[in-house]
């Protein structure tokens, strides 16, 4: 009888130890899964700084690791191109560390204005910013959103210049060009490096229109393709047609003066 009790006790002890081991293993596995989930979240957040968050989410969800698995799609997109007026002269006057701080503040404020109006920043080009509206998701109001973003950028620069003045730094001026057209949107590049981009003459024309802001002495210019999508609340001035490099026909643009305010808000 004593032997049977002893054997039963040993069996129960073995079962208990096995249960404890399984519980320990389950707890350890749960910790490992939690750690892996946190690492994945951090990785996605880091990648979202290099590519639009919507693209990163799709890559993860679809397990895409080759460019060919997510081919570019033909889309109609509104492109916004902006850069700093007089950047070269400013970069020669300021210490490199100060210049970097000024640029970072500029990029952050401009990016915020773009994101708040359903756009996404594609890339920074020196002091330039290239952004798209309607590239990631269909957006019937993409052109109006782009112009609202440009007006928000104008206001943000005015606020930033007051801050720069308090620090004894020169004010920034910007020129913004906006154009709407067709092209291919998707992942472009090699196996080693790829980026989400929009390929087509739309981007080139947006950049050319931006350069015309200096010619016409204004800060925001849009093409006829954009103007045709805007409602009467936007106040525009037609500019003389100009020939630009790479475009066969003279380009007609419109300067954006502002926009009527929605009820209860200030005008742009």
List where the protein language model places each region.
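Regulatory cytosolic signal-relay segments
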Residues: 3-74
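Catalytic NTP-binding/metal-coordinating core of nucleotidyl cyclase/transferase enzymes
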Residues: 24-27, 31, 41, 66-148
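Alpha-helix/helix-capping structural signal
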Residues: 54, 85, 182-183, 225
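A generic structural signal for short hydrophobic patches within well-formed alpha-helices
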Residues: 56, 87, 130, 226-230
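Short amphipathic alpha-helical segments
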Residues: 60-61, 104, 108, 206-210
């Amino acid at each position: 009888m004593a032997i049977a009790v002893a054997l039963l006790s040993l069996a129960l002890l073995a079962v208990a130890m096995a249960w404890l081991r399984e519980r320990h293993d389950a707890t350890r596995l749960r910790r490992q899964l939690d750690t892996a989930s946190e690492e994945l979240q951090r990785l996605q957040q880091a990648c979202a700084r290099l590519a639009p968050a919507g693209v990163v989410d799709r890559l993860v969800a679809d397990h895409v690791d080759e460019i060919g698995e997510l081919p570019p799609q033909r889309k109609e997109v509104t492109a916004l191109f902006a850069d700093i007026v007089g950047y070269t002269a400013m970069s020669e006057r300021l210490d490199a560390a100060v210049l970097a701080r000024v640029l970072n503040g500029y990029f952050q404020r401009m990016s915020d204005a773009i994101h708040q109006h359903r756009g996404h920043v594609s890339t920074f080009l020196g002091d330039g910013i290239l952004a798209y509206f309607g590239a990631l998701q269909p957006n019937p109001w993409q052109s109006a959103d782009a112009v609202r973003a440009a007006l928000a950028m104008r206001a943000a620069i005015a606020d930033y210049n007051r801050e720069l003045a308090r620090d004894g730094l020169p004010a920034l001026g910007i020129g913004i060009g906006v154009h709407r057209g067709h092209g291919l949107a998707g992942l472009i590049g090699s196996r080693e490096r790829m980026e989400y981009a929009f390929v087509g003459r739309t981007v080139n024309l947006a950049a050319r229109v931006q350069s015309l802001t200096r010619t016409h002495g204004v800060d925001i210019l849009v093409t006829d393709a954009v103007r045709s999508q805007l409602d009467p609340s936007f106040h525009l001035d037609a500019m003389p047609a100009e020939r630009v490099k790479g475009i066969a026909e003279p380009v007609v643009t419109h300067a954006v003066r502002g926009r009527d305010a929605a009820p209860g808000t200030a005008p742009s």
